[in-house]
């Protein structure tokens, strides 16, 4: 279904992952996030490299299930269980619908990431998720993920970032704006969505992410994918 949520000049409310967003999320993310499909493919590649037999894979902020599918399809390891978690009942419902008939080793759970226990985890993924968690809760979450990950397990985080250099930030923001225009979003839609989401999606810089990984205990962390202001990080325990 095509995303036309922000086509009208209505009173804007803060962006939320409700039924309206769940129904158009796949279209929204493909038209808003540069190289989104490549980002998903990199997750699949990382699982092949760092997944372990007889362990769990966690998809935190599972949304409509694209990451869980990447974790499950072409997985060369054996006896893995995927735990797909989202705190939006509407997203959980859509995720269950999308996963039906595609992968069967998955549990879809509605819950809060901050309350989740990670057991026997070789892979933990936050795909465009951490940016929606309150900044003052992020370090504690990454600390806990590091503690709970199996040795040689991997944390994969994909995020929108900002640049501390204002000139670079302006350049990349302009390119991202043109990306959205090229994908059919009008000026009204772009403006409305920005106003709706700006207090909900809080970005970090690359430097902040790497500092957070280091403070948690990760000694091996890299940015292994980037397109414009969207990046993926790989941190191995």
Curated annotation (Swiss-Prot):
EC number: 2.1.3.-
Residues spanning the membrane: none
Positions contributing to S-adenosyl-L-methionine binding: 36, 61-63, 86-87, 112-113, 127, 194
InterPro entries in UniProt: CmoA, Methyltranfer_dom, SAM-dependent_MTases_sf
Keyword Ligase attributed: no
Any Pfam family matching the protein: Methyltransf_31
Keyword list, A-Z: S-adenosyl-L-methionine, Transferase
Top-level taxonomic group: Bacteria
Xref: CDD domains: AdoMet_MTases (cd02440)
Catalytic function, reaction form: prephenate + S-adenosyl-L-methionine = carboxy-S-adenosyl-L-methionine + 3-phenylpyruvate + H2O
Gene Ontology MF terms: carboxyl- or carbamoyltransferase activity; S-adenosyl-L-methionine binding
Record's function text: Catalyzes the conversion of S-adenosyl-L-methionine (SAM) to carboxy-S-adenosyl-L-methionine (Cx-SAM).
HAMAP family hit by this protein: Cx_SAM_synthase
Family under the similarity heading: Belongs to the class I-like SAM-binding methyltransferase superfamily. Cx-SAM synthase family.
Subunit and partners: Homodimer.
Designated name of the protein: Carboxy-S-adenosyl-L-methionine synthase
Lineage start: Bacteria, Pseudomonadati, Pseudomonadota, Gammaproteobacteria, Candidatus Pseudothioglobaceae
Gene name linked to the record: cmoA
């Amino acid at each position: 279904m095509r995303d036309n949520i922000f086509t009208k000049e209505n009173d804007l409310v803060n962006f939320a992952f409700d039924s309206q967003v769940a129904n158009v999320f796949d279209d929204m993310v493909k038209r808003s996030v540069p190289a989104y499909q490549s980002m998903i493919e990199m997750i699949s590649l990382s699982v092949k490299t760092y997944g372990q037999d007889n362990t769990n894979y966690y998809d935190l902020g599972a949304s409509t299930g694209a990451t869980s599918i990447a974790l499950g399809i072409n997985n060369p390891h054996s006896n893995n269980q995927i735990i797909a978690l989202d705190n939006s009942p509407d997203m959980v419902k859509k995720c269950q619908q999308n996963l039906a008939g595609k992968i069967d080793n998955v549990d879809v759970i509605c819950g809060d990431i901050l309350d989740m226990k990670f057991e026997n985890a070789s892979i933990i993924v936050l795909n465009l998720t951490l940016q929606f968690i309150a900044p003052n809760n992020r370090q504690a979450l990454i600390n806990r993920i590091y503690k709970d990950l199996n040795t040689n397990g991997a944390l994969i985080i994909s995020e929108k970032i900002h640049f501390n250099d204002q000139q670079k930030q302006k350049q990349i923001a302009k390119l991202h704006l043109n990306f959205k225009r090229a994908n059919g979003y009008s000026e009204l839609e772009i403006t409305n969505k920005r106003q709706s989401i700006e207090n909900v999606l809080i970005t970090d810089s690359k430097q902040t992410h790497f500092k957070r990984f280091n403070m948690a205990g990760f000694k091996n962390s890299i940015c292994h994918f980037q397109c414009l202001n969207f990046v993926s990080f790989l941190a191995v325990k």
